[in-house]
Every structure is written in C-alpha cells, then in structure tokens.
Amino acid sequence: MSLLTEVETPTRNEWGCRCNDSSDPLVIAASIIGILHLILWILDRLFFKCIYRRLKYGLKRGPSTEGVPESMREEYRKEQQSAVDVDDGHFVNIELE
C-alpha cells in the first residue's frame, strides 16, 4: 500500500476559500496591513542603501560654520580636501597630532 492511500485527503468543498464573509472589519484590516507590509518590504529591499545611508549620514553634515569668517572656512575646506585626496589609487596616511 502506498502512503497516499492512507492519508485522508480533503474533499473538493474544503479546498474552497472560507473567507466568503470578507465584510468582517478584522479581515479588511488584516488585508490592508498585509498589503502595506508587502509594499514597504519591497521598497525597503529596492532602496535599502539609500534609506540607511540617509539615516546614518544624513544628520551628520559636519561642523557648523556659522559665525566663522570666510577665509577660515576656505582654509578648513582645503585641509579637509587635502586629507582625503587620493592620487593613482594609493592610500593616504593621515597622522593625528
């Protein structure tokens, strides 16, 4: 005897959808939440690099330059740029004082 003959198989009526009364508020709420969850999950997977990079670095804009003379701002920009300039793919050693 095969195993399939020993297992009770559901009748054709039991395969049907049992949620014919879909006007139940709980069913409607669950459906809406499920659809929103699916949409948010898809958007998260598509844009996760942008989203998490924005969350991680978005608030860190650097030190405030309010009230600092323009000459000092320019000097600071040049120092920062020279610290991260890389030529021909070599690493730059930055020594902290």
UniProtKB/Swiss-Prot annotation:
Annotated glycosylation sites: N20
Keywords of the record: Disulfide bond, Glycoprotein, Host cell membrane, Host membrane, Host-virus interaction, Hydrogen ion transport, Inhibition of host autophagy by virus, Ion channel, Ion transport, Lipoprotein, Membrane, Palmitate, Phosphoprotein, Signal-anchor, Transmembrane, Transmembrane helix, Transport, Viral ion channel, Virion
Annotated site location: Essential for channel activity, possibly by being protonated during channel activation, and by forming the channel gate and the selective filter: H37
One GO process term, biological-process aspect: symbiont-mediated suppression of host autophagy
Description of activity control: The M2 protein from most influenza A strains is inhibited by amantadine and rimantadine, resulting in viral uncoating incapacity. Emergence of amantadine-resistant variants is usually rapid.
Seems to be involved in pH gating (site feature) positions: W41
Membrane topology: Single-pass type III membrane protein
GO molecular function: monoatomic ion channel activity; proton transmembrane transporter activity
Residue spans of biased composition, Basic and acidic residues class: 71-80
Subcellular location: Virion membrane; Host apical cell membrane
Family annotation (InterPro entries): Flu_M2
Positions on the Intravirion side per record topology: 44-97
Phosphoserine: residues carrying this PTM: S64, S82
Lipid anchor positions (S-palmitoyl cysteine): C50
GO CC aspect terms: host cell plasma membrane; membrane; virion membrane
Signal peptide: none
Main subcellular location of this protein, as a coarse class: virion
Region (Disordered): 60-83
Residues in compartment: Virion surface: 1-22
Entry's transmembrane regions: 23-43
Domain remark text: Cytoplasmic tail plays an important role in virion assembly and morphogenesis.
Function of the protein: Forms a proton-selective ion channel that is necessary for the efficient release of the viral genome during virus entry. After attaching to the cell surface, the virion enters the cell by endocytosis. Acidification of the endosome triggers M2 ion channel activity.
Subunit structure of this chain's protein: Homotetramer; composed of two disulfide-linked dimers held together by non-covalent interactions. May interact with matrix protein 1.
Additional observations: When the channel is activated, one or more imidazole moieties of His-37 probably become bi-protonated.
Family: Belongs to the influenza viruses matrix protein M2 family.
Name of the protein in question: Matrix protein 2
UniProt source species: Influenza A virus (strain A/Brevig Mission/1/1918 H1N1)
Gene that this sequence comes from: M
